[in-house]
Amino acid sequence: QNAFPGVTNKLLAKDVDVVFAASAAAVEKLGAPEKTLVVGNPVRPEILNRDRAAARAAVHAGDRTVILSFGGSLGARRINEVVAELCAWEQANDLPVLHLHATGSRGVKLFEDLEAKNHFAPGANLVVKEYIDNMPDLLAAADLVISRSGALTLAELEAMGRASILIPSPNVAENHQYYNALELQNAGAAIVIEEKDLTGEKLVQTVSAMLAQPGKLAEMGKNARSLSVDDSLDRITAALLKLVKTP
């Protein structure tokens, strides 16, 4: 799944008949290039088939830039903290932005406290939810996504062609989320901010710079789309069928 394969995958790669890698970056690290196929990560069909215009109409986006931010089902405290500062900046400057944010189950009370502390509130330009249960629709509506960089999240961003600011989780094996995110940044599809460098001011500056450049988000989204492997499931299925039919 990841750009940086773990120890177990590296060990198993030596003894299996075929290895499936999510990206070309993982092939060399797996140590078995002659039997490794780049197949991407399969995404849900609804991710590939969402109507963007309908999705934007459903959230009443109009001509506004739609920013979608989340830190996972439980929430990520640091993401909630810096997104709160971003929301306060957006409202203080009356920006033409619709911000959709999911706090996660552990972040509900925290975000309410941050609203009071930073003097902003949900309303016409800010929707705050505990959990996103219609992610395909919101991804389709979004212009910019702020999130962690798990492999499947990135596969969906690529499939949708969405610009992103990626904040890799520091609490994962071998820092693999950082290497996942780096692939998108190197392709001009994302900006990576490691959590050790993350502040509200830095996030505001990053978003501000992106919004100030006409066409920047669309360009990044196009770059993300170029990384998508839409036929991932077909590639995997074909390789497996070939394998079982081989004497």
Describe each model-derived feature in a short phrase:
Residues R52-V145, Y178-L182, N186, I193-K202:
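Donor-nucleotide binding loops and adjacent catalytic segments primarily
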Residues K216-D230:
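A short, well-ordered alpha-helix in the C-terminal region of glycosyltransferases
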Residues Q1-A53, A58:
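Active-site-proximal region of nucleotide-activated glycan assembly enzymes
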Residues M135-H176:
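A donor-sugar binding/catalytic signature common to diverse glycosyltransferases
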Residues V19-F20, T36, V145-I146, S164, ...:
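Short, well-ordered beta-strand core segments
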